[in-house]
Amino acid sequence: FFSSRRRHTRLVRSRGLGDVYKRQVYNTNSYETLEALRMLDGLVDIYLPDLKYVSGAVSKKYSGTENYFEYAAPAVQEMFRQTGLLELDGDGLANKGVIIRHLVLPGSVDETRRVLKYIAENFPKNITVSLMSQYVPCYKAEKMPPLDRRLLRREYERAVDYCLSLGLENAFIQKMDSAKREYTPVFDGKCD
């Protein structure tokens, strides 16, 4: 995958198609090896990494692997090394940089606090963070309390308050009504 992406990006840039392909954006769950990410150095303009969990137990419960953070933390650091802080053009469009995304899960505000604390302690205070409230229970989550319900307003507000208390300066905060079916990709048609 990475080698074909590198070839494609180089081909696009060598043929002067920059006006067609303005930015190379890499959307990832961050469960990546450093070796793979280094293959993308200089080819990706904007990274959109998720940072889901710090706790191995939570990671195991929800993603089936205890070592998510062991891969994700250095991966996000590498993405930041490659592209730095988010930079916008005169029209407010992203030119380059990293937006670290975190989806606040129902019943998991303590895990969100651990993730935000890690970000605050390991990145500049003006790193861009997207603190997402758009969780919608789908598929097997419908039978896994507390993931069988939507995020409560008070849970999200606690997460936002903590984010701000850490001094993180550039946080995208969502409205609670973003957790709607029409905003959720349908992978198997089983979302409520």
Which functions belong to the PLM regions below?
Residues S30-L34, L51-F69, V98-I100, L105-G107, ...:
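Conserved radical SAM core fold
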Residues D41-S55, T128-Y135:
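Non-cysteine beta-strand/loop elements that form the S-adenosyl-L-methionine
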Residues V25-N27, Q174:
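Structural motif
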Residues F1-Y21:
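Single conserved hydrophobic/aromatic residue that forms the stacking wall/gate
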Residues D19, M79, Y156-A159:
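Alpha-helix-loop-beta-strand connector modules within alpha/beta enzyme cores
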Residues Y62-S63, E70-D89:
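Anionic-ligand binding region
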Residues R15, L34-L40:
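Distinct, well-ordered alpha-helical segments
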Residues G84-D192:
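Auxiliary Fe-S-binding modules of radical SAM enzymes
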